[in-house]
Amino acid sequence: MAEGGGCRERPDAETQKSELGALMRTTLQRGAQWYLIDSRWFKQWKKYVGFGSWDMYNVGEHNLFPGPIDNSGLFSDPESQTLKEHLIDELDYVLVPTEAWNKLLNWYGCVEGQQPIVRKVVEHGLFVKHCKVEVYLLELKLCENSDPTNVLSCHFSKADTIATIEKEMRKLFNIPAEREARLWNKYMSNTYEQLSKLDNTVQDAGLYLGQVLVIEPQNEDGTWPRQTLQSKSSTAPSRNFTTSPKSSASPYSSVSDSLIANGDSTSTCGMHSSGVSRGGSGFSASYNCQEPPSSHIQPGLCGLGNLGNTCFMNSALQCLSNTAPLTDYFLKDEYEAEINRDNPLGMKGEIAEAYAELIKQMWSGRDAHVAPRMFKTQVGRFAPQFSGYQQQDSQELLAFLLDGLHEDLNRVKKKPYLELKDANGRPDVVVAKEAWENHRLRNDSVIVDTFHGLFKSTLVCPECAKVSVTFDPFCYLTLPLPLKKDRVMEVFLVPADPHCRPTQYRVTVPLMGAVSDLCEALSRLSGIAAENMVVADVYNHRFHKIFQMDEGLNHIMPRDDIFVYEVCSTSVDGSECVTLPVYFRERKSRPSSTSSASALYGQPLLLSVPKHKLTLESLYQAVCDRISRYVKQPLPDEFGSSPLEPGACNGSRNSCEGEDEEEMEHQEEGKEQLSETEGSGEDEPGSDPSETTQKKIKGQPCPKRLFTFSLVNSYGTADINSLAADGKLLKLNSRSTLAMDWDSETRSLYYDEQESEAYEKHVSMLQPQKKKKTTVALRDCIELFTTMETLGEHDPWYCPNCKKHQQATKKSDLWSLPKILVVHLKRFSYNRYWRDKLDTVVEFPIRGLNMSEFVCNLSARPYVYDLIAVSNHYGAMGVGHYTAYAKNKLNGKWYYFDDSNVSLASEDQIVTKAAYVLFYQRRDDEFYKTPSLSSSGSSDGGTRPSSSQQGLGDDEACSMDTN
């Protein structure tokens, strides 16, 4: 399955398109196998057969032939074929079902040595089942009980069973099948769970990335090395979630120990409280800590272990944990009387219970950090998007959690049907009150009490001037950031002068500009005319894409390797030139397989040559001149004649006689047939690359050439024809692609690898980038949010007067604000081609945030807020790391939460470009009646920061201008 190539029979383009099109509509089924294909290869195949394209003019052209399936771009390590991290579906790879893969493999083959990337379909969700392909397998750490230092890594699907893991561990640690053994799930440093239900899947068991599993073989006398531990676990109460209220104890025994000697254990922290048996998934929900209990741990200063890319969850949880009204509600067990198990929109109270258990553990004062493993598993059951171990968005997790807690704790048991009324010119106060009361009739929970506010939206029809006013509840405020107007790109300029190295430039271009803008910017720095530039994306030693001048720069991703080539439209004598893509290929000695016998290397060329006066000899000379900086020419006496001797044939070492051939026509004219190497760029088994030509030639001596030419497809993976060696003119155009074929010996002798990769750095790369204003005030973001806008053509409003959709004007305003105001800074922006994160520093006040001026309800109460928490994101979109700053409600001090680590923080650390979600608490009358934070009697004797540290007096409400 892994290899392919050779001369292959394949149906015509229309048949391929039809057969694959039907298969690509296959629905995901649990347990089915799907295959990953590099999206670049797949896009090339789509061009070749005209898949999903209205332009059928170039369908079937040989230069578009994709060659064998090549997934090398998906691997971080070509040898182990380990997938790169953070690959994105459709952008980096496409998924095809088994039958589609088999057809493509049969038609095109696969690059030599590459194994298929096959993955299983797994199912997520408790009520609504959701299937997805598990692209990244779960890495587990495996060890044997008697030697815990010998840890081996293995990858498993979440659909694999515990029995599958046991079988693999027996093989790894040489444990016979007839010998009894037990599996233990080890987390933190001293907590073990027995995995006794072998038919459970990895997903059912809640195993996570990097989880340590221990296999314990039975002693010869029938006892178990950990027997004492098991005995203790059978008497210790544990918090278990079981599948029904009447279920028996979980099959997973939870054990805590810190010292194991001769089968004995010393129990340390393993805190267990009364059991919770309502709902659940059949595993222990204990949150056991690493350190022994300590009376010196400040409640709330509890870190959360990273279970594998779960920092986004930890960040959101720390912010919510330090939201005093919500945390007090759970610590006082007020939630127990309000759990709504019958709400069809809820999760039977299980999310509320899981969250309550975690909050109680975090505020117990006994644990320095806990592993929120069971909480994450519960979340993943109801929200499949969070079930894996890929990086997610802390704000999206926060939105799900607030909504889930609300529905689990909704005091409304039966939601009434309400008919919405139009404002019809009624006063805003009346319409807003009606909207809020209607909202509370269906939604009444601690989340609504604490987090919900009211928007006012005004829409005006541009045609009939109809005004529509609505009031809608919100749980968090998403604020846009002023968009960057430009972007910085780093590109390589390849000059036409063959003696000059490529130069790397850093240029500033319009964010939504065109390729021509890039060329103009580069022209200003280099002095080369923009019209003489061609911009290309180089990938795996080939041109992935050659851009047109009017194409948008949003098609170019930040990670693309962009080369800009200086080309000529006319030659020195004024004749018309054509620019040809030229690849370096090494012909390798063929193994017995039928896979490709050549490999691309080096940086490809864009070569300008005469369009109407080109012979093989002049082409060879032009290429030799172009690569003379890093390719030395053989001396005449090395081969007995000059390498440029007139009449030399294409690549022959022996005597030859040029055959009479017709002038070569370009492949699109249909006069050439594919050579026998069409499918993979191969020769007949056992042949020398040059022998193909030698079969046709006899007679006069012919010198050695450094390389031979082949006309190839645009990927350089399939030969179309050899070039005529009879001295006649070549007919090539801009759609032609050439390959220089080298043998290994010649390449090692004459090709300077180091010099070929060498480049210069322009001063623009050496100078520090000019820092434009990178800060905005929070008030600027709010003003942008409340600015009137015109709806886009794809997002129109239906006007009831005009009876049609209109691009109305829309204005959003704030009508009422909640006790806890959650502000989401919209840092991430993306479209089909472009993904970006705005690293703008948003200046937000730590205290005294006065929102009153932005509330359009003139009779509203004062809205003054103090910051209590911040969720931070470091890095780029889809990757990076999440942390949190939060203010402890007991001692008034700020702390930095970085997964399991908690450290004291100062206020001047909080406002950074990483701030992503802000939590503000409203100043209410009752807020000031509480005991002062400095006298809270905290264990560390913390005091509230002084006004000099704060920059503002405690009671001084500032406007949002922080300058």
Curated annotation (Swiss-Prot):
List residues, modification Phosphoserine: S445, S655, S675, S680
Short name of any one Pfam family annotated for the protein? Ubiquitin_3
Q: Where is this region: Required for USP4 activation by providing conformational flexibility between the DUSP and catalytic domains?
A: 229-295
Show the disulfide pairing: none
Q: From the UniProt entry, list the residue stretches annotated as the region Interacts with DUSP and ubiquitin-like 1 domains and is required for USP4 activation.
A: 485-775
Which amino acid positions bind Zn(2+), per UniProt?
C461, C464, C799, C802
Span list, region Necessary for interaction with SART3: 27-216
Which reaction is this enzyme known to catalyze? Thiol-dependent hydrolysis of ester, thioester, amide, peptide and isopeptide bonds formed by the C-terminal Gly of ubiquitin (a 76-residue protein attached to proteins as an intracellular targeting signal)
**Which residue numbers delimit the USP domain?**
302-923
This protein's domain notes: The DUSP and ubiquitin-like 1 domains promote ubiquitin release and thus enhance USB4 catalytic activity. However, these domains do not bind ubiquitin.
Q: What is this protein called?
A: Ubiquitin carboxyl-terminal hydrolase 4
